[in-house]
């Protein structure tokens, strides 16, 4: 069970109190609730409204106990333990037992007999406690109260008001944890019910948690409703693949098909919460375009159609093509692969292909970022943890919007601000809704001005806070697009002594970094340029030497492929639309003589590949993700045996391919990869210095122009959300954000259409007038009607044209 919400024993030795429960003395920290003290003794007091991560409310009254000296039973979930208190639970007190039976009878008066068809049946606290702490029959003979059922809270959450027992778990979660007022208690007395605000848009990223913590079947998920009973399902622990938060999850499946995912209980990471994307976006792995067999070009013709073939034949064709291009092959690895798979790509590139041309950053990036990662992040023990965020004297965010880019970081920062008064500052163009929910403070900055803003913080009130032990600076991957941004963040950390954390958006990026999938890094954060580091890797891999010259980054690989300097590409799980210029990526693939793709589903990359190998989704393979903290999150396959897909883990495909090329890769299993990585360990030598890139400062747009800024929303047009229409239904409405003066300059009013354009395309969306710097325009990067990279062919920091109308 997660640490009780009412107890804070983080610092020093807590003051203790001693009480007696059912005749047994127990000492607990001062402030502990009676219900928690009973739990420590193994006594389970029935309850519905109580939740260890929510503030106590005493709404359901089911946890009544007898307390010596009190005139009537007290709710144990709101009663604080005190010295010499004597408590008797339902196990030893007839008064407590009778009170609990009476409350249960009242709760069941209007509760429908839906158990045979209710989704909660079989895992329902009300069902279980009605049996253990309720009457065997009902004395109520009148007609039960009824409501229309169900009503839509959102596209993915349904409310059955007849089943609701008014425990207020859902409303407290929305208010206390998520900060989204999407559900509340309405009316009073016998008319009281849970409802939504008619004039408020439903825009919570965390609504699915209310379904999970509902103690009855009042809140259900649209996608799972009437699909299965809990006792029909097999449950497997898993790890979320959608972002770098590293959430523990539970995957429930039946007959080889995943039916639902729930948040796992991990107090050190996601506590008991997850975001809606992690909960519901899993159907992408069962779409009709999933690749189920290896593919090659018909008759070996580069322009021929892709046709199914055997694994052995596909291996032979791929081995022949890659062997012919040895030393002239680039490796592009997406940021979604596991730690072990990334290691296999890094090792395959070096010893099988003889190249350091490998990069996991299939997105806008920079050489400065590579230097920053090598100097500050790779091969280092966990510098900042989730717990550190709660105890920090200050947290500074730059190039990072946690609610959209790492939702569990957002929840932890909101908790830190709300419960521990941790001040959160962000360097950004405007204050987002997420920042308001964290009670955060904005350091308003023009895109490109982040380095100057960071330098200015070295002195003053914020600088003093950052100089306090435990202070944290969190940088997102978007800061890589600002020249001098990461250098300034590192400089500020050095000046103040603050700890530095890097939060990528994708689940596999930190693991790929630690695995050495960068052109200048070897596994464990070893610098490629260091002779000792290369010697260590050579010894571990049982080879004489490694290629010593620094390789090309992703942009360099694509440019070299486009001009035919490179003869082949090995591509693992990239999306061209993630790059600033998707057309350039596709042109590079078209120009490459030989392309091997390892992919889950058909894509623009597989259409251009000469050999395609199907790879398995996370539900069908073992592996590990490394989250933003540097914490290793291992998982086993949830689905075993025969399924619809015949894909293998990337490392198994690469191991077999290396064998066909006459090279022993040595990673046929995740255990083998982990053993090698453990033997190598992290680099204990000198890390590269840097980065030291000078800032160029923000550009100056003319009238009718603006600097583009933006980020990807959590719920957008990403392919990992394919097949989940209910989730897409609650994505936030895409808008163009402009300052009042900029909107007036182009003659646009709030809500009117604004067009953002370049010489290569345009985007038209409603205008949202926002308090932000002038001649700056914000767009969601990959939402419906606003796929910036595909439509504009530029990325953030570029100058674009803006105008009213379409």
UniProtKB/Swiss-Prot annotation:
Binding site for [4Fe-4S] cluster 1: 111, 115, 118, 124
Broad class of enzyme this protein falls into: translocase
UniProt entry tagged with the keyword Cell inner membrane: no
Entry superkingdom: Bacteria
Cofactor: [2Fe-2S] cluster; [4Fe-4S] cluster
Gene Ontology MF term list: 2 iron, 2 sulfur cluster binding; 4 iron, 4 sulfur cluster binding; metal ion binding; molybdopterin cofactor binding; NADH dehydrogenase (ubiquinone) activity; quinone binding
Residues noted as binding [2Fe-2S] cluster in the record, renumbered to the chain: 49, 60, 63, 77
Domain 4Fe-4S His(Cys)3-ligated-type: 95-134
UniProt keyword terms in alphabetical order: 2Fe-2S, 4Fe-4S, Iron, Iron-sulfur, Metal-binding, NAD, Quinone, Translocase
Catalyses which reaction(s): a quinone + NADH + 5 H(+)(in) = a quinol + NAD(+) + 4 H(+)(out)
Residues binding [4Fe-4S] cluster 2: 164, 167, 170, 214
GO cellular component: membrane
Sequence ranges assigned to domain 2Fe-2S ferredoxin-type in this UniProt record: 15-93
GO process annotations (BP): ATP synthesis coupled electron transport
Ranges that cross the membrane: none
Free-text comment on the cofactor: Binds 1 [2Fe-2S] cluster per subunit.
Binding site residues for [4Fe-4S] cluster 3: 240, 243, 247, 275
EC number: 7.1.1.-
Annotated family: Belongs to the complex I 75 kDa subunit family.
Database matches in PANTHER family: NADH-QUINONE OXIDOREDUCTASE SUBUNIT G (PTHR43105:SF12), RESPIRATORY NITRATE REDUCTASE (PTHR43105)
Function, in words: NDH-1 shuttles electrons from NADH, via FMN and iron-sulfur (Fe-S) centers, to quinones in the respiratory chain. The immediate electron acceptor for the enzyme in this species is believed to be menaquinone. Couples the redox reaction to proton translocation (for every two electrons transferred, four hydrogen ions are translocated across the cytoplasmic membrane), and thus conserves the redox energy in a proton gradient.
Name by which UniProt lists this protein: NADH-quinone oxidoreductase subunit G
Organismal lineage: Bacteria, Bacillati, Actinomycetota, Actinomycetes, Mycobacteriales
Gene field: nuoG
